[in-house]
């Protein structure tokens, strides 16, 4: 083997070693990259696991806060609706109260009504002697019907005619524009036993209050049933 052949053989060996080294280096590089990617993925997953509970906790806090805010807004809306309903009902009651003044303004019909109220009050009290209180403007009307009211009561209750004393202290006058929300009486009577232990308020205002309270569920149903549906 001459020098040329030896030189060729050495070059072939060098190429082989270099190729093998490059392949080995490439394998190492690929393996290192795969290992790096695996470690990177593991680190990412580990961080996700750390972050997830905190994220879930904050997400729950946000959901709870949203529910609370929604509930508060819903309650506020309901309160506004109820307030509007109450305002409407109260305005109807105020209009009805204004109508009472027309009742007492018609003396012909009001006089008959006063008699009925006195008889009804006597039947409730069933006392031999009572004290009657009315508005100052109604005294003459009450005195005009008093005897017939006593006789009607005595006939219905099958008792002697009672003694009725018209009190010198009067019920408040009817409401005016200046004292619309002050103490007032739209008409009617208040009867009490002599000792004052039994009192029956049979004023127009008291009867309106009782009737309105009794009919309130029906009024609300008729006014707001469609809105509720």
Curated annotation (Swiss-Prot):
What is this protein's name? V-type proton ATPase subunit E
Q: Which family is it part of?
A: Belongs to the V-ATPase E subunit family.
Q: Which InterPro entries match?
A: ATPase_E_C, ATPase_V1_Esu
Which keywords fit this entry according to its UniProt record?
A: Hydrogen ion transport, Ion transport, Transport
Q: Does the keyword Ion transport apply?
A: yes
Q: Which superkingdom does the taxonomy of this entry point to?
A: Eukaryota
> Subunit details for this protein?
V-ATPase is a heteromultimeric enzyme composed of a peripheral catalytic V1 complex (components A to H) attached to an integral membrane V0 proton pore complex (components: a, c, c', c'' and d).
Q: Which SUPFAM superfamilies does the record cross-reference, listed alphabetically?
A: V-type ATPase subunit E-like
Q: So what does this one do?
A: Subunit of the peripheral V1 complex of vacuolar ATPase essential for assembly or catalytic function. V-ATPase is responsible for acidifying a variety of intracellular compartments in eukaryotic cells.
Say which species the protein is native to: Spinacia oleracea (Spinach)
Q: Which GO terms describe its molecular function?
A: proton-transporting ATPase activity, rotational mechanism
Q: Which GO terms describe its cellular component?
A: proton-transporting two-sector ATPase complex, catalytic domain
Annotated gene = VATE
SS bonds (residue pairs): none
């Amino acid at each position: 083997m001459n020098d040329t052949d030896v030189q060729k053989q050495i070059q072939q060996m060098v190429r082989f070693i270099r190729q093998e080294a490059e392949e080995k280096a490439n394998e190492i590089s690929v393996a290192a990259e795969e290992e790096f990617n695996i470690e990177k993925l593991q680190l990412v997953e580990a961080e996700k696991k750390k972050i997830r509970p905190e994220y879930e906790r904050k997400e729950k806090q946000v959901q709870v806060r949203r529910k609370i805010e929604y509930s508060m807004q819903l309650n506020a809306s309901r309160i506004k609706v109820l307030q509007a309903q109450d305002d409407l009902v109260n305005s109807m009651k105020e209009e009805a109260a204004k109508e009472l003044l027309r009742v007492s303004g018609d003396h012909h019909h009001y006089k008959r009504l006063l008699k009925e109220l006195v008889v009804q009050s006597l039947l409730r009290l069933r006392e031999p002697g009572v004290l009657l209180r009315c508005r100052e403007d109604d005294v003459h009307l009450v005195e005009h019907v008093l005897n017939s009211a006593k006789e009607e009561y005595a006939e219905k209750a099958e008792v002697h005619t009672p003694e009725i004393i018209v009190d010198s202290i009067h019920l408040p006058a009817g409401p005016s524009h200046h004292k619309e929300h002050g103490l007032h009486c739209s008409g009617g009577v208040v009867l009490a036993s002599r000792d004052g232990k039994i009192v029956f308020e049979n004023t127009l205002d008291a009867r309106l209050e009782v009737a309105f309270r009794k009919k309130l569920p029906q009024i609300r149903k008729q006014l707001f049933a469609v809105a509720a549906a």
